[in-house]
């Protein structure tokens, strides 16, 4: 059983929901990436999604695009992201880390080389936005063989066939995109999310995390009432953007802690 699967199993036994915050590696500068990862854990993160900056992040809204631009301007690369995970692991052997990004940097490194390097660094999962499950069978198989969970996106428009493809190729959890469009945009339709989550869970047999459109403790709590995990990214990037550098980590911890506390007031949590 993978570290991600073990985390969800533990949380389920506690009646708790997973909190999965996202930051972009290298933003606001590479020296803050590892401290910010520890700050997320201090705030109550169960799993960290670490963004690999890319020059054309098609699924990301302006906030995460800006984070990618800042990181790339500082010289952040996939290999440097892996080095950051390695450094994080020297102080935290337990918190699962999922790399989230795009195919181009992985293809440049080579899929097999990426899988090996990611596992060696201490990465637990990879969510590659433009790797549809039906087209990356070899990557998914190689990832699973190495103990790396391949994680896939589902959306309100996803078909039953896509559910089946994701169930076959994926492991760890599903990232359900709760809005049509890009990250950080729009408003949540909670009724639609609540209707879709049981369908997805039954079809894929994995925990379902919901992201896109979650901006505060209240929206996180509302999503946590129906999902297995809450994914929050753009709002954390905004917190980093508006913070003086020396206060970024403490401000991020404070913000994440508020989300964690809201999730832990949901019915069913075993105190």
From Swiss-Prot:
Gene3D superfamilies: Aldolase class I (3.20.20.70). Keywords: Amino-acid biosynthesis, Aromatic amino acid biosynthesis, Lyase, Tryptophan biosynthesis. SUPFAM superfamilies: Ribulose-phoshate binding barrel (SSF51366). The keyword Disulfide bond does not apply. It holds the Pfam family Trp_syntA. Its EC number is 4.2.1.20. It catalyses: (1S,2R)-1-C-(indol-3-yl)glycerol 3-phosphate + L-serine = D-glyceraldehyde 3-phosphate + L-tryptophan + H2O. GO terms for molecular function: tryptophan synthase activity. It comes from the Bacteria. It is an enzyme of class 4 (lyase). InterPro entries: Aldolase_TIM, RibuloseP-bd_barrel, Trp_synthase_alpha_AS, Trp_synthase_suA. Pathway: Amino-acid biosynthesis; L-tryptophan biosynthesis; L-tryptophan from chorismate: step 5/5. The active site is at residues 49, 60. GO terms for cellular component: cytosol. The alpha subunit is responsible for the aldol cleavage of indoleglycerol phosphate to indole and glyceraldehyde 3-phosphate. Tetramer of two alpha and two beta chains. Belongs to the TrpA family. HAMAP family: Trp_synth_alpha. This is Tryptophan synthase alpha chain. It comes from Azoarcus sp. (strain BH72).
């Amino acid at each position: 059983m993978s570290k991600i699967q073990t985390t969800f199993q533990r949380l389920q036994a506690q009646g708790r929901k997973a909190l999965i915050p996202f930051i972009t590696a290298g933003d606001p500068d590479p020296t803050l990436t590892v401290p910010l990862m520890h700050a997320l854990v201090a705030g109550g993160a169960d799993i960290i999604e670490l963004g690999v900056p890319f020059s054309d992040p098609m699924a990301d809204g302006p906030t995460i695009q800006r984070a990618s631009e800042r990181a790339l301007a500082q010289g952040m690369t996939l290999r440097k992201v892996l080095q950051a995970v390695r450094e994080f692991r020297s102080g935290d052997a337990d918190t699962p880390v999922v790399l989230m990004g795009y195919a181009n940097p992985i293809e440049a490194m080579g899929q097999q080389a990426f899988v090996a390097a990611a596992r060696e660094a201490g990465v637990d999962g990879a969510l590659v936005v433009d790797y549809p499950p039906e087209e990356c069978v070899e990557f998914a198989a190689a990832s699973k063989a190495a103990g790396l969970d391949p994680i896939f996106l589902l959306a309100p428009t996803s078909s039953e066939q896509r559910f089946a493809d994701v169930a076959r190729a994926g492991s760890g959890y599903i990232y359900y995109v709760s809005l049509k469009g890009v990250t950080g945009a729009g408003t949540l339709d909670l009724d639609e999310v609540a209707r879709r989550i049981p369908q997805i869970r039954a079809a894929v047999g994995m925990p379902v995390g919901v992201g896109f459109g979650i901006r505060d403790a209240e929206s996180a709590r509302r999503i946590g009432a129906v999902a297995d995990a809450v994914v929050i990214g753009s709002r954390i990037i905004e917190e980093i953007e508006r913070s003086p550098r020396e206060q970024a980590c403490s401000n991020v911890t404070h913000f994440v802690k508020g989300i964690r506390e809201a999730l832990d007031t949901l019915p069913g949590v075993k105190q």
